[in-house]
Every structure is written in structure tokens, then in C-alpha cells.
Amino acid sequence: MTTTEEAPKSPLFEAIDKNDTEAALALLKTKEQAAQRDPSGMSVLAAAAYRGNLTLVEKAIELKCDVNDKTDGTLYTPLMFAALSGKQDVCRLLMDSGARMYLVNGIGKTASELAAFVGHHECVAIINNHITIDVIEDLLRPKVNGKYEGAEEYPDELAVFIHSLCGSHEIHPVKIIFRFSKYPDSLKYKKKILYVIDRVFEKQLRCKESNEIMSLKLWLILFSMRETSKFVESNKEKSPEEASLQYAKLISTWQEGDETRRALDVMLRNAVASFPYKHSLLHDTLQKALQKSQIGERPSAYEYIVQALFGQRIAAVCQFCSVCGHPGAKKRCTQCKLAYCSQECQKFDWPIHKKVCSFLKTRQEVSPTDETAMSLDDIQAQIAKIDV
């Protein structure tokens, strides 16, 4: 934002611009101070979000700054500035505090669209897939006249665990299984976990601002949780952690001659096929896209799903872990260059990977822009019409 000599910025805004957190906090102690605007019309919260300063954003929200305030002239909101700064934690905090993702600026762009334009694809995913923990709490412990009257008490950790599933943009089945295995009470509270996820899922297409992308994402998570729970319950001789990790290895198997993990491919295709809202435009176009490749061939079902949910651009610029699908995988097999996000995933996959490493080394990676292999123009054109 530019200013004129006749209208200099206040010391508070000067401190925010310099990212001098200590100085800014000393000048930001009252609601009156938090209500200031700089000469361009930017609020204190917007300026802090633009600088990606989480501490100052927290303080401004504490002092009751409007998280949906629009900067004079440009109509930019704090969430839009956070999206431009690329600060994922600031985006998440603003949305947890009530920032609305559907607001548009002076040129009709949402925060998500601005983040995508400047290449902050993790912020795009966070904004488009946000669910507050309050939503989980309300379903886990519904209150009557402000008081929970349920027969069973649930630990706070359960709400945090369910929120970590619903609020994340990571939908890979193995990632879901890893989370299941690390939460000690996954099986104990299985029914409640599945119930809450199912209720959040159902709300996505039954509200005023229906969200097809969120609906499909939650369905994939719910499907993985159900399948994992079934497997763990059918292997009672093992601990829930052991059984769930065995299931993860089962769906991660890779046979020589296949370009993808066949069992995982089948599972994801079944998940998409079983999506209950068949009238969904997103579901219909994704189903058609999946028919373009055979099971075990590239592009995999996961590649199609990622592009459908998060856009073709994020799939092109992010390297996904070959085990859990985590974006930004930086580790590589020295021989075949298969990507991993961590030593944990690499170690987990080694008994499987060592059998196909030589085969994968001889395979040339299929280009995602190869029209004969993967052309998602149709699905992207349809997704572009969906208001998300």
C-alpha cells in the first residue's frame, strides 16, 4: 500500500511494517489502538496479516478487530492479505476466528483465488478445507441451554483428533491410517468418531453455501476411517496400532509391472464410486476422469482426486509423498527417485519398495501434461463452475 507525505503512518503501523513485534505490541494494548487505520484504509489486523505476523494477528483478534473488515477502496480482507503473504498459520487462525472464505475484493477475487494466483497452494487448500473445532465440539458434546447433558464424557483429545482429520487437506488413506494408529483411543471411540465425521460430511451439501469439494474430501476421509476400523476389529489378536499399520502396508503393496499401488488405487476408486450424492457435478466429472486410466496405471486414482479437489496447478507444483500423499516431499530413493516426505515413510515402505525399485528405475515417469495419459481439461472446466 502506498501513502502520501501529508498522511504518514502512525508508529504502530510503522512497527508492523518493519515486523517489529515487540514495538508493535507495546503500541497495541487497547481496543482504541486496535481500531486505527493507516492512510490507505488498512486495519491493524489486515496489516499484521499482510506481514504474516501471527503474534500481532492474535493480539488484534484478542482486541476485537473485525476479521472480515474490508480495506477502503480495494475491499481486501485480513484473510486475503494472509493468503497473499503465504502464512498458513495466519490463514488458519483467521478462519478459526470467523473469517469468511467467500468474500470477494474489488475485482471479484476470493482469498483462495488470490493465494492460488501467487502460488501459495498450501494456503489455498487450508482455506478451501477449513472446519473449526467448534463445529466438532458441537457434534461431540451437543449442549441444551448451554449445558452438555450426554450420558458419556468425551476427552478434549478426542475433539482435537477428529478436528485433525476433518480440518486437514490431506486425504490419502495411508495418512488417515497413520493418524488412526497414533491416537490410542481410535477404536474405543470408533462409533463417535465416525458419527461426527459423517455429520460434518452431511452438512456440506445441505447448507446455504454448499461445498462439493469439502463434501467429497470428507467422504474420502470417512471411507478410509470406516475401512480401517473394520480391519482393526477383524484382527483383535493385534493391538489397534499394529493392526492399523498392517492395513496400511496391505493397501500400499506394489507389484512389479504396475505403475501405481494397485490395492490403494482400488480402494480410492471404490471410495469415489460409493459417494452417496450421485447428482454432484464434481463427483460425476471425477468418475469420468477415473475411467481414463486402468487400475495400476498412471495417472493413479489419487492423482486424479488431488487435481479434482485442489486444482491442477497444485498437483503440478507439489511433489507428493509416495506413501502418505503429503505435499512437499523432499526425500528421494537414490535409485528410482521415488518421493518421500520423511524417514518414517521411507522406512515403512522399504520392505515393499525394495521389490520394485529396479523396475521403477527403468520406467519413465508419465508426464501429467500428456494428453493421451491424463487430460483433465474437462474436469477442470466443470470444477471452475463450482462456487467454492
From Swiss-Prot:
List of residues binding Zn(2+) 2: 333, 336, 353, 357
SMART domains per the UniProt record, alphabetical: ANK
UniProt-recorded Gene Ontology molecular function terms: zinc ion binding
Coiled-coil residue windows: none
ANK repeats: 40-69, 74-103, 107-137
Keyword annotations: ANK repeat, Cell projection, Cilium, Metal-binding, Repeat, Zinc, Zinc-finger
GO biological process, one term: regulation of egg-laying behavior
Binding site for Zn(2+) 1: 321, 324, 341, 345
Transmembrane stretches, start-end: none
Disruption phenotype: Fails to localize guanylate cyclase gcy-12 to sensory cilia.
Compartments where found: Cell projection, Cilium
An example Gene Ontology CC term for this record: non-motile cilium
Keyword Zinc-finger listed: yes
Entry-linked InterPro entries: Ankyrin-MYND_dom_contain_2, Ankyrin_rpt, Ankyrin_rpt-contain_sf, Znf_MYND
Zinc finger (MYND-type): 321-357
Annotated tissue distribution: Expressed in many ciliated sensory neurons.
Function: May be involved in the trafficking and dendritic transport of signaling proteins, such as the receptor-type guanylate cyclases gcy-12 and daf-11, to the cilia. In ciliated sensory neurons, required for the calcium flux to the cytoplasm in response to onset and removal of a nitric oxide (NO) stimulus and is thereby required for the behavioral avoidance response to NO-producing organisms like P.aeruginosa.
PANTHER family attached to this UniProt entry: ANKYRIN REPEAT AND MYND DOMAIN-CONTAINING PROTEIN 2 (PTHR24150:SF8)
Protein's name in the database: Dauer abnormal formation protein 25
Source lineage: Eukaryota, Metazoa, Ecdysozoa, Nematoda, Chromadorea
Gene: daf-25
